[in-house]
Design a protein with these regions (language model features):
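N-terminal export signals
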Residues: 5-23
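N-terminal lobe/hinge region of extracytoplasmic solute-binding protein
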Residues: 33-83, 114, 183
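A bilobed periplasmic-binding-protein/Venus flytrap-type ligand-binding module shared by bacterial periplasmic
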Residues: 66, 204-207, 277-301, 305, ...
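Aromatic- and charge-enriched surface segment that lines or borders ligand/interaction sites
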Residues: 77-122, 136, 142-144, 241-244, ...
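Surface-exposed binding/hinge segments that line
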Residues: 91, 125-196
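Ligand-site clamp/hinge motif
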Residues: 93, 211-263
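Ligand-binding "clamshell"
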Residues: 127-128, 262-274
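Structural transition elements
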Residues: 322-353
Length: 353
């Protein structure tokens, strides 16, 4: 492959799911260096980012979030809401097939969601509102609610932990134990015989994958599979990974260290860019349960004393295209972003405050 790229994560944004690779031209195989070793293959069992990214290759969810973080139908055709908001009826799309050749059925979805709810904190909210999830036929899920719950689709489009759909026989696995067989209905099949922990993982195009017809928008819409094969090379050493990219041994470096980015920008044949516009959040979190940082006045003083721009320069370098500071509680660029609580950056607190 002639085209090589890397993903530089912004240091001031939440860790959100990455867009699936879509390399055009005649490329058939993509060699990708993930940010960490792939130690777990179960996105319900762990919230590790590398496992989440792995799951985007092989699994799908009933709903996916678009670029504005709105839930959109993914595995389902859509839903209807009646009984004064207390009954949601969801219909699965036609043609959905698992990697083992079996059709995706409503009971697979219910079993998968029940396993997910035993691990995700949102279960407290959902279970308090759900009377039952029924499957009147193989393609239909009916949620009977105790009271209206407009955020149901939003919760089902979560990206971490992901409510991925697996066959009922696998969904019966104890949620506190990892899945040992990887079978989804996503665009790529995982190739377990090629897994070498700490070194290599591989995926093959799933020929029976049925993409949606809408334009892709982040985790929603139609994701076209333009590759026959994807290989993950685990290269923990940053310098080694950089050399592999420059020499053409690999095609995509997900998370290069900031100090090598200037080198990559000058390297022949290497394309650099910021694909994850939200990135990861850098946080200084004092322990508020013990002295002296259980004193809110001290924590406010610490907050005022730390200049986030200086911190980001120290961590990421002076090129501000790769980070954002200061930031409020929500991610820069999202609808909820605001400056609440940030006034002290422009107007210092008084002693009384």
């Amino acid at each position: 492959m002639k085209r090589r790229a890397f993903l530089a994560a912004a240091a001031a944004g939440a860790a959100l799911p990455l867009a699936r690779p879509a390399i055009g031209g005649t490329a058939k195989t993509l060699v990708f260096v993930p940010q960490a070793n792939l130690t777990s293959l179960d996105p319900v069992w762990t919230t590790a980012t590398v496992t989440r990214n792995f799951s985007l290759m092989v699994y799908e969810t009933l709903y996916g979030r678009d670029q504005a973080f709105n839930p959109k139908p993914l595995m389902v055709q859509g839903h209807t809401i009646d009984d004064d908001g207390k009954r949601w009826t969801m219909k699965l799309r036609e043609g959905l097939v698992f990697h083992d050749g079996t059709p995706v059925l409503a009971r697979d979805c219910v079993a998968s969601l029940q396993r997910w709810l035993k691990r995700d904190a949102v279960s407290v909210t959902i279970n308090a509102r759900v009377d039952a999830i029924e499957t009147p036929d193989d393609k239909t899920l009916v949620w009977r609610l105790k009271k209206p719950f407009p955020l149901l689709a939003h919760f089902l489009s979560k990206v971490q932990p992901q409510p991925v759909i697996v066959p009922e026989r696998l969904a019966a696995t104890d949620p506190f134990k990892q899945l040992t067989e990887i079978v989804g209905c996503g665009p790529f099949r995982f190739l377990p015989d090629e897994l070498v922990s700490g070194h290599h993982a591989a995926f093959a195009k799933f020929d029976k994958y049925v993409s949606r017809q809408e334009p892709a928008s982040y985790m929603s819409g139609g994701h076209k599979v333009l590759l026959d094969r994807v290989e993950w090379r685990i290269i923990p050493d940053g310098a080694t990974a950089t050399n592999a990219l420059v020499s053409g041994e690999v095609d995509w470096l997900e998370l290069p260290s900031p100090d090598v980015i200037p080198v990559l920008k000058k390297a022949s044949g290497v394309n650099t860019g910021l694909l994850d516009i939200y990135g990861t959040v850098a946080i200084l979190r004092p322990n508020s349960s013990i002295a002296p940082t259980n004193n809110v006045m001290l924590r406010k003083a610490m907050m005022a004393a730390v200049d986030p721009r200086e911190a980001m320069i120290a961590a990421m370098g002076e090129d501000e295209s790769g980070w954002h500071a200061p930031m409020g509680y929500f991610l820069p660029g999202v609808a909820a972003a605001n400056d609440a609580g940030m006034a002290f950056r422009t107007k210092p607190w008084s002693v009384d405050e």
